[in-house]
Amino acid sequence: MEILKTLWEKSSVGEWKIAQLRPLKLLPAQGYGEDYFWIANRFEFPTTHRSFSFGQLVESTGSTNSFLKQSIVPVVALVAGASFLRVIGTAFVISASGLVMTAAHVLLDPEDSGYGGAINENGAVRFDGNIQMGVLFPLPSTSYGPSAVRFAPFQSSRFWGGWKESPLFHERDRVDFDTDVAICRLLPHPGGAYQPLNLSLRPVEVSEQVFAIGYAEMDDIPVRYVDGAVVLGQFSQDLYVSVGTTTAVHLDNAQTRSVSTPGPCFEFDARIPGKMSGSPILGGDGAVIRGVVSKSLSGERHAFGALLGPATHLPLFDQESLKDLMAKGSEGVPRIQGTGL
């Protein structure tokens, strides 16, 4: 099993471009099976490129895990003054400019888990001001050590749906999603380019082999405060792969609501533990993203994914869709084209 990984850079005239394209083999670590496993830490040899900066060359060298952690990241939430950083899901980079995708319900975890609130502000969603949400990116191990990370806060978030008013006095209104997909924007990368995964506009097919990659059951991270700065304690950040086959596709679920996952979605028979919500689901033999992990049935190999293709047509921050951004090239959104992709 492998994933097709691109390495992006910004040209001297400010255009995003792919500098490298390489397959990464995903092998189980010792003691794991082939349908659910922690990724073995194979070393990936660098591919030289004359226009690379030193930092980019460092990023192009390392283990399979270090490569993937540039593109697949844990979603975290910090409540002001709390003693730990909550790990609430997984996200993945979809543009070199700093767009990341996750499951929409991950962003409402503060409301659902009772440590924060989402407020109806004239039909828009506003979160409590004492909560910071974002993702963690690895820093180059040669300069900062093997487990150093950088917190990248969400600057803005976009999901699709509206407020559903509860008829019961004791229940709060809540967001009713059109699809379980959300896109968040980060500040520009300090080193030039984020490293996105390849997207597909094609729907997944029944009986297609797919696999999700995410931070299964990752523990919350202890924090302490030094001169007003947040310092993270020791933590483990391990990526897991869960392999399955699609069993049903619900393209018209927005109208029929035949399953509880909102919007166009599909079912697949894979083990999906907690904290993998928002993980990318890959198909096309690992070349492209087909969907986003939405939910799973506890203790069973039965999960649901939100389809990526239909979500690419929805309006984003400036009313342009993800498909529009693919065509323009202004954000560095990758799309790999070919038979079956």
Model segments located where?
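Active-site region of chymotrypsin-like
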Residues: L68-F84, L187-P196, V226-K328
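Cytochrome P450 catalytic-core helices
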Residues: G98, T102
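Conserved catalytic-core segment of clan PA serine endopeptidases
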Residues: G55-F67, V79-S83, I88, G114-G192, ...
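Short, flexible surface segments
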Residues: T90, A96, P203-E208, S277-G278
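N-terminal activation segment of mature serine protease catalytic domains
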Residues: W8, S12-T90, A103, D178-A182
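Short glycine/Trp-rich loop-beta-loop segment that forms part of the substrate-binding cleft
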Residues: L26, N198-Q237
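Short, charged beta-turn/beta-strand-edge "cap" motif at the junction between a beta-strand
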Residues: V106-L107, A216-D219, S296
